[in-house]
Structure formats: structure tokens, C-alpha cells
């Protein structure tokens, strides 16, 4: 790895961590943890799936996802239903109250970020748009 690549990796990592921290604090009264909100958001965006599929999508171990799902179900944010093909499996989906929570959290983050982006000029915003696309591609291609 070139020194410039190592520096870029370090700078990007720091920027992503700081941005993540800022976004995390946009909804401090949320009743769910970040891992719970991430699972809810995945279900809201991608639809019902098995706990195993959700664990893979969230890149966590199945027992960890089982605990996340159980706590979300206890709070009424997800619904469980029998799998239509494999009776041994269940499908987890976001409930109506879970979908509302995802929308509220998304809205709080987007409002804060929109305020910050408004301080940038068009060229800077275009650079961030390209960077966001590249970063998403890097993450989505990662094993």
C-alpha cells in the first residue's frame, strides 16, 4: 500500500467515524440502539427476511441478530410470521411502529446533514455526492 493510500484510508476512516457519531446523536431519545435501528432500517428498506439473512446483511453473528430481533419484537417494532415455504424458519418484518421509528430517525439525520451541506458550495456538494457513491460501492462490494 502506498503511503498516500494509507493516509487516505486513515482520513476516510476518521471522517466516517466522526460523521457516524454526529448522526448517532441526532435522535438521542430513540428507544433503540444503533444496531437495532440498523436492523430495522434494513427490514424497512429490503422487506421481510429470515433472521439468518438479516444477520448476513447486517454482518453480525446469528445469535447476536436473534437477540436484536427479540428485543425489537418485545418493543413492538418488528413482526414475526411463519416462513411460507420452510416451516422451520420465520420471517421478520418491520411493524408499523417500527417503520415510523425508522422514518423519524432518518428525518432527524437528514435534517441535520442538510443543514451542514447547505454551508458548502455546489462544487463541494458534487464532490461529496461522488465520494458517497464510491464509498457505498466499496462497502457493498466488501466481503
UniProtKB/Swiss-Prot annotation:
A Pfam entry, by short name: MarR
PROSITE patterns found in the cross-reference section: HTH_MARR_1 (PS01117), HTH_MARR_2 (PS50995)
Protein's name in the database: HTH-type transcriptional regulator Rv0880
SUPFAM superfamilies in the cross-refs: Winged helix' DNA-binding domain (SSF46785)
Key word Transcription present: yes
Keyword Lipoprotein: no
DNA-binding region: 51-74
InterPro entries (alphabetical): HTH-type_Bedaq_tolerance, HTH_MarR-typ, Tscrpt_reg_MarR-type_CS, WH-like_DNA-bd_sf, WH_DNA-bd_sf
Keywords attached to this entry: Antibiotic resistance, DNA-binding, Transcription, Transcription regulation
Domain named HTH marR-type: residues: 5-137
Primary role: Part of a regulatory network that coordinates tolerance to the antitubercular drug bedaquiline.
Amino acid at each position: 500500500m502506498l503511503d498516500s493510500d494509507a493516509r487516505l484510508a486513515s482520513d476516510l476512516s476518521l471522517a466516517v467515524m466522526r460523521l457516524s457519531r454526529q448522526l448517532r446523536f441526532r435522535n438521542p431519545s430513540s428507544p433503540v440502539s444503533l444496531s437495532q435501528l440498523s436492523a430495522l432500517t434494513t427490514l424497512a428498506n429490503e422487506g421481510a427476511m429470515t433472521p439468518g439473512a438479516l444477520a448476513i446483511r447486517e454482518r453480525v453473528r446469528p445469535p447476536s441478530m436473534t437477540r436484536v430481533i427479540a428485543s425489537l419484537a418485545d418493543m413492538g417494532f418488528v413482526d414475526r410470521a411463519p416462513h411460507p415455504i420452510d416451516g422451520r424458519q420465520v420471517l421478520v418484518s418491520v411493524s408499523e411502529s417500527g417503520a415510523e421509528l425508522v422514518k423519524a430517525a432518518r428525518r432527524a439525520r437528514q435534517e441535520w446533514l442538510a443543514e451542514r451541506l447547505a454551508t458548502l458550495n455546489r462544487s463541494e456538494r458534487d464532490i461529496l455526492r461522488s465520494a458517497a457513491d464510491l464509498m457505498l460501492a466499496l462497502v457493498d462490494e466488501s466481503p
